[in-house]
């Protein structure tokens, strides 16, 4: 994608209200409480030499001899790449899963640059001739390759070579829903990172839009769409990938999309799938945010009806829904309703290492969630060391801290205990103000 376009969009969508990042003296190795764990997308291996537990441990273990460990890792990665062309489907799937783990947890740009053509050919065969899980894993690895290689000629070449296959699998109604789901995510992320031509962006938007638009009802926004349960995940992934690309879309395209999609998108709020309802709600909030960026006094004709639906979802107490789903839905739609009505997005803070990332817009939330989905537990490592992510989120150059600096930044245990105790007390007070005082009522 064009660097100027991405930079302008992110300043507009992510930092206009003071969002950004700054160094922090408080280390927090855990992830944000509200971050959802990525879905497991792996298969059991039939190739113990490639997918043993020791192989996985070597990808994320403590660094003892960094150079020696890097050499061992590269040797294993060479084996994985060689196994991508094995005759056994299970061996290929095992190699793809091992590559996925490695690319999510480490930065390997030099290794990948040397083998990008080999990897592109292997992934092309997996997407063309593979079935189901193999296609899904190949698409996931492609998305990670785009994150590793970043924007520029090499990343763009890789994306262009495999984009037609992603579109083909995604558009094939006979393909596995899991494969189509991962192709939708890879298409959105790859286009966001590597596409430099506006026509690539427009074509990817159209392809993703066609996936969820075909399930709109025929009777207007009040008609519930009929979506097979097996396709709920696919529609959620396509909608989220489409929303990701909206964050870099030119204003002229945004205007057409608002006219075409905003009146119809609320239909998905009545879906039986909580994930699809949440994806639709967050996308609606993003569309309102983009619309108000274009026109400060933006007015939506069916505002009252939309807010009524959002309010119902924000207070849903149906017992037939799982408690965790109800809690997640209410939390999300309270934020969506607040944003649609008042135009403000609740700020979220993500701490990693000695740094802090502030997210104060729906555009920034969507971008973070897209990378989090593919990187999983490796998200913090990439935020600290991946120049692409640091550029996108405005984190500046990679911090180089020696042992002395690390020791100086480390907070004493007693001070950390006092800070956590004060934060816990403040959080308890804040929550108690909005809880139902049933004892007082009785």
Swiss-Prot record:
UniProt record, GO biological process: adipose tissue development; fat cell differentiation; negative regulation of translation; Wnt signaling pathway
Pfam families attached to this UniProt entry: IFRD, IFRD_C
UniProt keyword terms in alphabetical order: Translation regulation
Family the UniProt entry places it in: Belongs to the IFRD family.
Function, in words: Ribosome-binding protein that acts as an inhibitor of mRNA translation by promoting ribosome inactivation. Associates with the P- and E-sites of the ribosome and inserts a C-terminal helix into the mRNA exit channel to preclude translation.
GO molecular function: ribosome binding; translation repressor activity
Region span, Disordered: 1-71
Listed Polar residues bias regions: 43-56
Protein name: Interferon-related developmental regulator 2
Species for this entry: Homo sapiens (Human)
UniProt GO cellular component terms: nucleus
Entry keyword annotation includes DNA damage: no
């Amino acid at each position: 994608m064009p660097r100027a376009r991405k930079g302008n969009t992110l300043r507009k969508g992510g930092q206009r209200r003071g969002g950004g990042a700054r160094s922090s003296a408080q280390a927090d190795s855990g992830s944000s409480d509200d971050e959802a764990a990525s879905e497991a997308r792996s298969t059991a291996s039939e190739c113990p030499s490639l997918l043993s537990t020791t192989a996985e441990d070597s990808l994320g273990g403590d660094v003892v001899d960094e150079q020696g460990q890097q050499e061992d890792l590269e040797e294993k990665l060479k084996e994985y790449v060689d196994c991508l062309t094995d005759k056994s489907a299970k061996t290929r799937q095992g190699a793809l899963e091992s590559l996925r783990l490695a690319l999510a947890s480490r930065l390997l740009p030099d290794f990948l640059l040397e083998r990008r053509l080999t990897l592109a050919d292997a992934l092309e065969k997996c997407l063309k001739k593979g079935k189901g899980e193999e296609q899904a894993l190949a698409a996931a690895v492609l998305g990670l390759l785009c994150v590793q290689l970043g924007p520029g000629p090499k990343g763009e070449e890789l994306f262009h070579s495999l984009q037609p296959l992603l579109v083909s699998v995604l558009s094939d109604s006979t393909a596995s829903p899991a494969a189509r789901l991962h192709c939708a995510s890879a298409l959105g992320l790859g286009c966001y990172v590597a596409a430099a031509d506006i026509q690539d962006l427009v074509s990817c938007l159209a392809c993703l839009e066609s996936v969820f638009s075909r399930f709109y009802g025929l009777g207007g926004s009040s008609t519930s769409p009929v979506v097979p349960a097996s396709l709920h995940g696919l529609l959620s992934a396509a909608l989220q990938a489409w929303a990701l690309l909206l964050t870099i879309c030119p204003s002229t395209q945004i205007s057409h999309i608002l006219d075409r999609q905003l009146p119809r998108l609320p239909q998905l709020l009545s879906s039986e799938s909580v994930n699809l309802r949440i994806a639709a709600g967050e996308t609606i909030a993003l569309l309102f945010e983009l619309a108000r960026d274009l026109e400060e006094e933006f007015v939506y004709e069916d505002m009252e009806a939309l807010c009524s639906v959002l309010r119902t979802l924000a207070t849903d107490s149906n017992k037939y829904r799982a408690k965790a789903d109800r809690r997640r839905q209410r939390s999300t739609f309270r934020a969506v309703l607040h944003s649609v009505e008042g135009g403000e997005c609740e700020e979220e803070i993500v701490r990693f290492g000695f740094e802090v990332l502030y997210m104060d817009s729906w555009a920034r939330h969507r971008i973070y969630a897209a990378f989090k989905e593919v990187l999983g537990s490796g998200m913090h490592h990439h935020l600290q060391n991946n120049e692409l992510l640091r550029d996108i989120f405005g984190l500046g150059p990679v911090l180089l801290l020696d042992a002395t600096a690390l020791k100086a930044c480390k907070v004493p245990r007693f001070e950390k205990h006092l800070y956590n105790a004060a934060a816990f007390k403040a959080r308890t007070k804040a929550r108690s103000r909005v809880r139902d005082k049933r004892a007082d009522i009785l």
